[in-house]
Regions:
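N-terminal glycine-rich, Lys/His-bearing helix-loop that initiates the first secondary-structure elements
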Residues: 1-47, 425
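PLP-dependent enzyme catalytic core of the Aspartate aminotransferase-like
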Residues: 1, 115, 124, 142, ...
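Short hydrophobic/aromatic beta-strand micro-patches
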Residues: 218, 341-343, 403-405
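Short amphipathic alpha-helical segments
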Residues: 48, 74, 276, 280, ...
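Active-site beta-loop-alpha junctions enriched in small/polar residues
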Residues: 152, 181-183, 319, 345, ...
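Conserved PLP-enzyme active-site core in the AAT-like
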Residues: 7-16, 76-307
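Conserved small-domain helix->loop->beta segment predominantly found in fold-type I
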Residues: 268-271, 275-277, 286, 291-293, ...
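Conserved N-terminal alpha-helix of the aminotransferase class I/II PLP-enzyme fold
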Residues: 30, 35-87, 109-117
Length: 425
């Protein structure tokens, strides 16, 4: 099936008992066992079924199946946020003493997780420029458990050469984890370019309406975990915390996502509410239509800003003069979502005047909403970074980030025009 159809139908058919066509909300903590043996078999992973909503839930299962189908994966795990998804994806394969290699241009929360939080747990991150694959590859050693990148960077809007990075990682027997939040599977499917694990913040374009926080981890099911038992011992040796199960034996190609569910999620508990899963599923049904309008509007806004005398610079990979325009053509069909950034003449002071003058575009730090949104990253999402870190992340202090919505483009541009005029002071 095509993506547009999968987004509506994958993972669910009318309920056999009630004949309900919409996905039901299974708002329950627990699920009954047929008998003692059934309960034991569920806990031993011998049979499929529901145990407890911290680990699995039928509403969440539909979302997981649907997202796995859209990305082309073997399985998925829905969790409470995109940050939980990234954390659990890393913790599934890495432990104290290990490291991951990551591009430096990242969402501020992700950078903070990798640079400051995970090191306190003994997992180090080694950063290099997103466009220097050789430098990234050079950081991989025997304790590297994954390479990490964003398909489209937030907020910089940079495009990563996924195929080249995947090849570099695979030369060393290491998987590539790609955060595909900004691109969504409508614009880019990282597994088709060699990625092994995909994560999303479902809060953004997937949900699409700013109503629900959620995240997901998706497993391609193609990485040969069992071929390197020493590097990936967590997947290849008996786990004393879960009845001595060996995940590559119990789950086969889905070993990664199996361990992700029964270790990080089960033990740390960032479970997605079934109600949030239901709301995200509603948004997912219109994802393809919305992305078409998002990208169309973003290109119009980018052209408008580029021609405005009050604008110092514009970064949007959909513009022909962007240094990564060819990568945008290759990986997103020339439609690199609707996150763009620009600088206003007059620096941070003028930028603040611009933000304060907006009337239609909403001042907040989310992206991927049906509504157009604006923020000043250096004072919000990336506030915790020092000047050196801001430079590495591609976030100058005069940057304004726009997430272009699906309103009429004329109205978006009219609001930007009056705010730019106000920025003059």
């Amino acid at each position: 099936m095509k993506l547009e159809t999968l987004a509506i139908h994958a993972g669910f058919s009318p309920d056999p008992t009630t004949k309900a066509v919409a996905v039901p909300i299974y708002q329950t903590t627990s699920f009954a066992f047929d008998d003692t043996q059934h309960g034991a078999d569920l806990f031993d992973l011998k049979v499929a079924g529901n145990i407890y909503s911290r680990i699995m839930n039928p509403t969440n299962d539909v979302l997981e199946q649907r997202m796995a189908a859209l990305e082309g994966g073997v399985g998925a795990l829905a969790v409470a946020s995109g940050m939980a998804a990234i954390t659990y994806a890393i913790q599934t394969v890495a432990e104290a003493g290990d490291n991951i290699v990551s591009v430096a241009k990242l969402y501020g929360g992700t950078y903070n997780l990798l640079a400051h939080t995970l090191p306190r747990m003994g997992i180090q991150t080694r950063f290099a420029a997103h466009d220097d694959v050789a430098a990234l590859e050079g950081l991989i050693d025997a304790r590297t458990k994954a390479v990490f990148c964003e398909s489209i960077g937030n907020p910089a809007g940079n495009i990563v050469d996924i195929a080249a990075l995947a090849e570099a990682a695979h030369r060393h027997g290491v998987p590539l984890i790609v955060d595909n939040t900004v691109a969504t599977p409508v614009l880019c499917r990282p597994f088709e370019h060699g990625a092994d694990i995909v994560v999303h913040s479902l809060t953004k374009y997937i949900g699409g309406h700013g109503t629900s926080i959620g995240g997901i981890v998706i497993d391609a099911g193609t990485f040969p975990w069992a071929d390197n038992k020493e590097r990936f011992a967590l997947l290849n040796t008996p786990d004393p915390s879960y009845h001595g199960v060996t995940y590559t034996e119990a789950f086969g190609p889905a070993a990664f996502i199996g361990r992700c569910r029964v270790v990080p999620l089960r033990n740390m508990g960032a479970a997605l509410s079934p109600f949030n899963a239901f709301l995200i599923l509603q948004g997912l049904e219109t994802l393809a239509l919305r992305m078409e309008r998002h990208t169309e509007n973003a290109l119009k806004v980018a052209h408008y800003l580029q021609a405005h005398e009050q604008v110092a610079w514009v970064k949007y990979a959909g513009l022909p003069d962007h240094p990564e325009h060819q990568l945008a053509q290759r990986y997103t069909g020339g439609k690199p979502a609707s996150i763009l950034s620009f600088g206003i003449k007059g620096g941070q002071v003028a930028g603040a005047r611009f933000i304060d003058a907006l009337q239609l575009v909403v001042r907040l730090v989310n992206i991927g909403d049906a509504k157009s949104l604006a923020c000043h990253p250096a004072s919000t999402t990336h506030r915790q970074l020092n000047d050196e870190e801001l430079e590495k992340a591609g976030v100058p202090r005069d940057m304004v980030r726009l997430s272009i919505g699906i309103e009429h483009s004329d109205d978006i541009i009219a609001d930007l025009a009056q705010a730019l005029e106000a920025s003059r002071g």
